Design a protein with these regions (language model features):
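Periplasmic polypeptide-binding modules associated with outer-membrane biogenesis and secretion
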Residues: 1-186
Length: 186
């Protein structure tokens, strides 16, 4: 996390509140790339000490004090690493239409679950190949960002939504909703 090459705050640099906020975002993102699904930049704050000398401020990043007053359950949730249990693909999702059970099809393999109505939007292997979120892997915010990018690059897909559901103490199910664009008539 304290990657000296990437950190935004260095000794001798100008005191800038925007840069301090960007550093909080960078650290929180680094935590989420390492499996800490619930870690948020709002958990971090700074102490700034200007008594050191003329035009000098010592800045220290720390965790917010309100964390001390939170339940142990909350603290464990925030500082626990999460793994992906299953990746669910919901294909051709249409919020305006709830299909009957007879219309829905489901298949699964190796921790991936596919649910669709009618003709399948894409083959399972195409979906899996383009999905950097993998069952058994640690949660990684960067994998989620790459998944959005990859799915938006596939021709038939116009809508992508990725969400997570906590299913046990340290496991998340990933839900990926993919929809094709509406056909336009002329």
């Amino acid at each position: 996390i304290a990657n000296n090459q990437r950190r935004l705050i260095t000794g001798g640099s100008q005191f800038d509140a925007e840069v301090l906020n960007q550093e909080r975002q960078r650290v929180a993102s680094a935590m989420r790339r390492r499996g800490y699904f619930y870690f948020d930049q709002e958990l971090l704050c700074y102490d700034a000490d200007s008594t050191r000398g003329r035009k000098q401020i010592d800045v220290t990043m720390r965790l917010q004090e309100y964390l001390q007053h939170q339940s142990e359950e909350y603290k464990e949730k925030v500082f626990r690493k999460y793994h992906i249990a299953h990746v669910h693909f919901h294909l051709d999702y249409d919020p305006a239409r709830v299909p009957d059970d007879e219309e829905m099809f489901t298949s699964s393999a190796d921790g991936y679950v596919f649910t669709w109505v009618g003709k399948k939007l894409l083959r399972d292997k195409v979906l899996v190949r383009n999905c950097p979120i993998e069952p058994g892997a640690m949660y990684n915010e960067r994998a989620v960002e790459r998944a959005y990018t990859r799915f938006h690059q596939l021709a038939p897909i116009k809508y992508v939504d990725i969400s997570f559901e906590q299913i046990s103490a340290n496991e998340l199910d990933c839900h990926i909703v993919l929809s094709r664009g509406k056909l336009k008539s002329v």
